[in-house]
Amino acid sequence: MCITVISIISLAGIIVMLQRHISRRKIKERFCLVSSGRPVGKSCLIMTMQSCGPIIDKALECLSSNDNIEVCKNHRTGSQTIDIISDKVRDCSADTEGKIGKTSLYCEYMLEATDKIAETTRHLVTSPDSYIPISYKCEIETIRGGIVRLSRLADGILGVDDDIIKIAGDTGLEKDFIEHSIAVHSKGMTHEDFDEGAPAYSYLMLLYYLHSFVSFFSQALRNIETNNKLKTA
């Protein structure tokens, strides 16, 4: 009986390991970086945005629907994706001395912010006193829609300067909305709400990480614009 139980547990462990290996392989194949005709900085930014966008989208969806199973799954699989993409960003952009380019550095920051977003939403949804007011949900759905839109526009980074300027403008609007949300939320918080682990504080930190993500994307776009101008000067 004991041998049978041990065998079942061992088999289950092997299956889990195989599933993780297959999952990581699929992620690597999906984001196998960019053909040799594309500029490296733009390619890294597109890959980063298109990998982070779905993770953030799912995290905010789980927060709105209070889905504690999917939010944990998203954090786990999202962390795997982020690790792989982070390695690819460094591999594709490092020079002979191993230094990473400025645009790719912003991509690293975007990946870190995405991991924090997935982690914070998991904490908010799974905490014992996880109550998300309707006002928060409306706010989150608005931010979610904005980030999904930016993720879909990411391919435009490879286009002409006018496309990049348009994306930068949309990014600025998203950034302004999150800044406004942070100001309103922090103004309405009590002294106790600022205790670490309090739902209101965790929500404030989520807004901060979302703002960081959009800000780093904006800075990466500006860096690409600057590089384009230098090349055409």
Task: Label each region the model flagged.
Residues M1-T4, I8-A233:
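Cytosolic, long alpha-helical scaffolding segments
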